[in-house]
């Protein structure tokens, strides 16, 4: 790289992978975090700095971890000093692993992880080595060490700083778009622009598939609907949620653009694929009441899709930390598919105000929410955890929130 002094801001999972990658390249790494513990537990940094320290001199460039805001004081200081700020995605896309090998990228508001994991599963069933990485849980700078087709899930955080073209992706897809992370991006327009930045990563911009006319690229709707009709004809398949069919068909379309995969193999993959947890995860039935864990639903749009998929009268558990939007748009779906709402956590009162006129009970936490939902439920009802909010008011992650819900329901023993 030729650059010797690099600042890495944020030393979580991705930040550690960035520091490790740079250190192995012989770079002098200056690690920055708000936590002394995080600094102490990262052996790849040469200089430990707290966020309250002064911005150092003689820095070649700055790498911000995906969760670090572009308005972070150190990011602002770097830009004021005309020092380049990049993400792990931009570092990875300059390496020979991406320049010389086939890779795909997926972004969108909802469905990214399911789509990319199904794409990985489908390609492997077809005998094609493939590895999912990025926002899916394996940092891209770690995952790219695997040989084979690289499948990169990219968040708006990772794409927000994309100003330079890194044309390495053979295929790409923007699945969908709806309000999300407005607390981070500041506006819906800026959020959309971060997603559109995926086009800067394409070898050929015409190979970017999009599902919304607000984006530049090839519309995938006609092809995806054709594949969805194919699945509808397969009576041997277990019933699928509408959004799952959509995600699987998007993955198949992306795969088909590069590899000839038989429809029969696609159908077999759909039948045997195990979806990741906390995404419309059916937990079972107790006393005639059905329980679904959709803790991953951290946006209003995701909860709307959950309600549409159920298509029956549900008692919906909402709440957590608001990501910067109103809950009013949920009302049409709630009136159609829900009996009532139990609102919990930091923005429970805000939910009750936005859903004025619809039955809402306000509680403090998830335990109380489940007890309240069970008091209201009768045989045939669905208790749906689909919070439409981030989890950070009371939990470390949506995974922890979902795991505790499963434990409270009594469907799974969980050790946390």
From Swiss-Prot:
Belongs to the MurCDEF family. Its EC number is 6.3.2.9. Pfam families: Mur_ligase_C, Mur_ligase_M, MurD-like_N. GO terms for molecular function: ATP binding; UDP-N-acetylmuramoylalanine-D-glutamate ligase activity. It is found in: Cytoplasm. The keyword GTP-binding does not apply. Pathway: Cell wall biogenesis; peptidoglycan biosynthesis. It comes from Chlamydia muridarum (strain MoPn / Nigg). It comes from the Bacteria. Keywords: ATP-binding, Cell cycle, Cell division, Cell shape, Cell wall biogenesis/degradation, Cytoplasm, Ligase, Nucleotide-binding, Peptidoglycan synthesis. This is UDP-N-acetylmuramoylalanine--D-glutamate ligase. One of its GO terms (cellular component) is cytoplasm. Its main location: cytoplasm.
């Amino acid at each position: 790289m030729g650059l010797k002094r690099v600042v890495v801001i944020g030393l979580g999972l991705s930040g550690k992978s960035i520091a490790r990658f740079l250190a192995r390249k012989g770079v002098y790494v200056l690690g920055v975090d708000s936590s002394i513990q995080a600094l102490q537990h990262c052996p790849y940094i040469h200089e430990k700095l707290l966020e309250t320290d002064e911005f150092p001199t003689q820095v070649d460039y700055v790498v911000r971890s995906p969760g670090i805001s572009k308005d972070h004081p150190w990011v602002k200081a770097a830009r004021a000093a005309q020092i380049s700020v990049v993400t792990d995605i931009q570092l990875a896309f300059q390496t020979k692993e991406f320049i010389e090998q086939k890779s795909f990228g997926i972004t969108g508001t909802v469905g990214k992880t399911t789509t990319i994991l199904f794409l990985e599963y489908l390609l492997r069933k077809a005998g094609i080595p493939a590895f999912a990485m990025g926002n899916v849980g394996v940092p891209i700078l770690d995952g790219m060490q695997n040989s084979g087709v690289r499948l990169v899930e990219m968040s708006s955080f990772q794409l927000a700083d994309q100003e330079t073209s890194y044309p390495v992706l053979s295929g790409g897809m923007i699945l969908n778009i709806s309000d999300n992370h407005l607390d981070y991006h500041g506006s819906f327009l800026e959020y959309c622009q971060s997603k559109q930045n995926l086009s800067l990563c394409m070898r050929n911009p015409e190979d970017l598939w999009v599902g919304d006319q607000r984006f530049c690229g090839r519309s995938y709707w006609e092809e995806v609907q054709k594949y969805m009709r194919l699945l509808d004809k397969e009576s041997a398949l277990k019933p699928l949620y509408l959004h799952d069919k959509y995600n699987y068909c998007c993955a198949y379309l992306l795969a088909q653009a590069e590899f000839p995969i038989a429809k029969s193999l696609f159908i077999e993959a759909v039948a045997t694929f195990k979806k990741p947890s906390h995404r419309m995860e059916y937990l079972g039935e107790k006393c005639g009441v059905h329980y679904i864990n959709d803790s991953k639903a951290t946006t209003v749009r995701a909860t709307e899709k959950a309600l549409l998929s159920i298509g029956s009268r549900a008692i919906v558990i909402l709440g957590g930390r608001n990501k910067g939007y109103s809950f009013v748009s949920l009302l049409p779906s709630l009136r159609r598919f829900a009996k009532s709402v139990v609102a919990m956590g930091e923005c429970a009162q805000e939910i009750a105000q936005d859903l004025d006129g619809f039955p809402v009970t306000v509680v403090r936490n998830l335990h109380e929410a489940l007890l309240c939902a069970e008091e209201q439920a009768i045989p045939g009802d669905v208790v749906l955890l689909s919070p439409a909010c981030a989890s950070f008011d009371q939990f470390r992650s949506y995974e922890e929130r979902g795991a505790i819900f499963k434990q409270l329901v009594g469907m799974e023993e969980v050790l946390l």
